[in-house]
């Protein structure tokens, strides 16, 4: 879905503010897709923990030197494909079923990293900063916090056994079956958050994780 010119979103509308920063992380803009992440392109950090990004002219600068003019579209939260596969089978009295599901493409904003990597949360989070792990994370939206949204998950798995009933029992019971079901047995994903499926994919905050998880 793209916004037509008739919607008159000239210059774009910033949307979403998470991670205990005042930065918006998505933009609604004419001719662009819903769910675009918007911010600064990450270029790296120095030995002192200072973050660097790319300016609009392609030069590497400290994040403190970047302005809104340097912001670019960093990717989109919507997956290219969402898929699912389910199967059931039986052998004599034993039955087995499972389902797989997943998504291909799209970016996820790890707001947990953004929030707890922000200096404003150090005191409340009781975090220890030492020469080994000390950094000065930026209070800016950057693709440093964007991760792949591709995943595959083994969802529900059920193993059952149907009892063979004699004629006397059938007077009172049509059938009897015992089964065991397990959920969310395995997830294959490069997302470093809790679960790529817990990320918000509705409303206006597409692809943003929840700092509460």
Predicted regions and their residues:
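Conserved small-residue
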Residues: 1-77, 183-193
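Flexible, surface-exposed loop regions and adjacent strand-edge segments
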Residues: 9-18, 113-122, 191-203
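Membrane-proximal, glycine/serine-rich, low-complexity loop/turn segments characteristic
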Residues: 14, 33, 41, 88, ...
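Extracytoplasmic loops and strand-loop junctions of Gram-negative outer membrane beta-barrel proteins
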Residues: 23-24, 65-73, 78, 126, ...
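Outer-membrane beta-barrel architecture
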Residues: 41, 86-88, 158-162, 181, ...
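Residues that define the transmembrane beta-barrel architecture of outer-membrane proteins
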Residues: 79-83, 150-155, 213
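Transmembrane beta-strands of outer-membrane beta-barrel proteins
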Residues: 85, 91, 96-98, 176-180
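Extracytoplasmic gating/loop element in the C-terminal half of outer-membrane beta-barrel translocons
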Residues: 101-185
